[in-house]
Regions:
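Conserved beta-strand/loop scaffold segments within soluble protein domains that form the structured core
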Residues: 1-114, 125-132
């Protein structure tokens, strides 16, 4: 089993390059990659993850997720999920998203008397699952 979890908070002119490769060689193997990031100011994230499933790796379960929240128009994200699947008897999925701040959520917090800075911080922490 392979689990990769990452949470990145990028601000100012931070640059982060995330790269991983998971190679499934035997039957019944499992992997789950879950990477989230928030980006502000002129920060940049590059995410590249490759999952390789050999022909002999039947009954493999491989999941790949990358979610990114842009908190400014000048922040940038490049996300490249790659699946190299060489057998049919598997369960694999991937998904990548890049989204902006939900203005309705921001407005709802501000209507409760929370200033813009704190409202954005709350949304960022909720996105990263830092608040329960």
């Amino acid at each position: 089993h392979t689990l990769v979890n990452g949470k990145y908070i990028l601000e100012e002119d931070n640059i982060n390059n995330v790269a991983c490769q998971i190679h499934h060689k035997g039957p019944g193997s499992y992997s789950n990659v879950d990477v989230k990031s928030t980006l502000e100011d002129k920060s940049h994230l590059s995410f590249l993850c490759e999952i390789i499933v050999d022909k002999s790796a039947i009954d493999t379960d491989a999941q790949l997720t990358n979610k990114n929240l842009q908190l400014s128009k000048t922040a940038t994200v490049v996300t490249e999920p790659q699946l190299d699947i060489n057998t049919k008897e598997i369960s694999c999925s991937h998904g990548c998203t890049v989204s902006n701040v939900d203005k309705e959520q921001l407005y709802a917090l501000q209507s409760k008397g929370i200033n813009d800075t704190d409202a954005r911080r709350i949304l960022k922490e909720c996105f990263l699952d830092l608040i329960i």
